[in-house]
Curated annotation (Swiss-Prot):
Record key words, sorted: Cytoplasm, Magnesium, Metal-binding, Nucleotidyltransferase, RNA-binding, Transferase
Gene3D superfamilies membership: GHMP Kinase, N-terminal domain, K Homology domain, type 1, Nucleic acid-binding proteins
Lineage: Bacteria, Bacillati, Actinomycetota, Actinomycetes, Mycobacteriales
Natural source organism: Mycobacterium avium (strain 104)
Enzyme nomenclature, EC number: 2.7.7.8
Record-linked InterPro entries: ExoRNase_PH_dom1, ExoRNase_PH_dom2_sf, GPSI/PNP, KH_dom, KH_dom_type_1, KH_dom_type_1_sf, NA-bd_OB-fold, PNPase
Protein name: Polyribonucleotide nucleotidyltransferase
Parts forming coiled coils: none
Amino acid sequence: MFEATATIDNGSFGTRTIRFETGRLAQQAAGAVVAYLDDENMLLSATTASKSPKEHFDFFPLTVDVEERMYAAGRIPGSFFRREGRPSTDAILTCRLIDRPLRPSFVDGLRNEIQVVVTILSLDPNDLYDVLAINAASASTQLGGLPFSGPIGGVRVALIDGTWVAFPTVEQLERAVFDMVVAGRKVDGADGPDVAIMMVEAEATSNVIELIDGGAQAPTETVVAQGLEAAKPFIEVLCTAQQELADKAARPTSDYPTFPDYGDDVYYSVASVATDELSKALTIGGKAERDARTDELKAEVLARLAETYEGREKEVSAAFRSLTKKLVRQRILTDHFRIDGRGITDIRALSAEVAVVPRAHGSALFQRGETQILGVTTLDMVKMAQQIDSLGPETTKRYMHHYNFPPFSTGETGRVGSPKRREIGHGALAERALVPVLPSLEDFPYAIRQVSEALGSNGSTSMGSVCASTLALLNAGVPLKAPVAGIAMGLVSDDIEVEAGDGTKSLERRFVTLTDILGAEDAFGDMDFKVAGTKDFVTALQLDTKLDGIPSQVLAGALSQAKDARLTILEVMAEAIDEPDEMSPYAPRVTTIRVPVDKIGEVIGPKGKIINAITEETGAQISIEDDGTVFVGATDGPSAQAAIDRINAIANPQLPTVGERFLGTVVKTTDFGAFVSLLPGRDGLVHISKLGKGKRIAKVEDVVNVGDKLRVEIADIDKRGKISLVLVEEDNSAPADAPAAAPADATS
């Protein structure tokens, strides 16, 4: 058994210890590592590879799975069969966090199936497992003898009291204004060893605005850039520990066959026949027209080279795509113009409108160029919040953001149905962007479901979803703390030959940052950088890069460029709606009241009898929390008020007095009399001797039955609070009508 340890020093915030161990568990896997975070957190990562390649695949078949075991938290799964089922959202998002830096680290052209399975064995509820899983997956892959350019280190850093803290606990995150997951690897830079950042997933916390108001540092673009730099030393320590383990226990790298997308001879032939016409086609502004022309050219090239490269049609197609990529990048780097004619900082045409779906509680349509997003908001009682049964710290989710990407959004056919990992990831990104500006439960006692429908896609539907969702939430009457917009940035870089004044030529590394990237620019560029935020600070950020590091000044420039675009988009959104609308008449009106905790049982009643009766009779929905908070919802005010009055009558009763008169309902008959409901939870007895109006009766049911209305007066209240009633003659003065209580079992 071999071990390696990384110590994370957070100064006054203490230290965290990450320990990697191999040789004890999963010995038949190509590479297996047990990773520990301090003493309480333990997970196993196992990497395996198929023996033969999938030659017919035109992609790298890497699969990452995260298996949450509920025994890790000492719990039995809540499902019907009491065993784990489909992966939770947290597990799926962790799979994506692992996949994004791992995939580009394998050699190009690899077609053997690679599977990484991470199993959560033990978890302290005060810790998160996702970042530990990134390191474990990298370490196990490093040991497996695979063509892998790792190791990769992953760290979560949170801005707490002005300090970037690595591997923060859940408790510490409550004091953070911003946290980010950063993954990267060690490289040799121009100025010595450095860390190349490969992936970033970041967000402002839910209480960021309150913390800023209290004097905390706002997560501006400058602060976020500082956080990325602060993560690098921690990543270096983690990579060093993984490399130490690999030096002791890694298998020799096996000779895996690779399948290049095309041969050099194919590329030269395609370039010679297609460059001129393809360059012209790539200046067409409209996506549909441009795609149609490039498809036509591709067909011509395939036909022209069919005889020369018979049986190598896939290589011709791949070479045509590579030529397209080269021409797109070349025009950006040399001319600073893009395939749709825009400059590098130009945003496509924007439009925004609200109230586009008639009966929805809130809706909006946001369009940026050919990317079109429909946002729809639904409000409901807090009890409709999502119940979460996973290893994460969240047990309920009040704000749920769901993203749908149907195939027609790109003019194609395909499968529809349950969401894929990409859709779950995009929905989670948009959700994180909006959570920091949502009103508190006290200010807005609703569960909120936000759905983003991608109706048209040509670049960054996730950031379009952020914009459409802000508009729809405001249209639904949700009092957001600030509007949020998002934009996708891109980066193109290359070594460009430049000529000096003396005529000498040299290569110069040139970076060009693009604002509002198209789908093609995303595919052909070096970076996908999505930034969402308010006019004052960043709320969410996602970065994926194919480069071995991005210079700090380039990244800072991209963040600044993104803010300029965000402010422009916010202005367009404000023209459509700049403050919350009145709530839809179809949305429930939810009111919050409080009752004493010791009265909760009385409000609910035996087997829910009282609360069910109030719900049935008033039409209101009622939800009671353990702390005595009661949410009452109804589509009209009178129904909600009637339910509130009934609840208050039980929880905060005003005791009736002798002489008061009521119109009550008979709720129970006995041999000795009839019990009449006066107020919710408050009954009185009309003795059998008082029912006959002076005449003797043999049986109570001969005079009254359950459900009958009786006008009664309180004749006496004994020391135990039991109420004796007498009938009131019809010609007497009118009694005080009280709302009838829900029938309740009375005791003699």
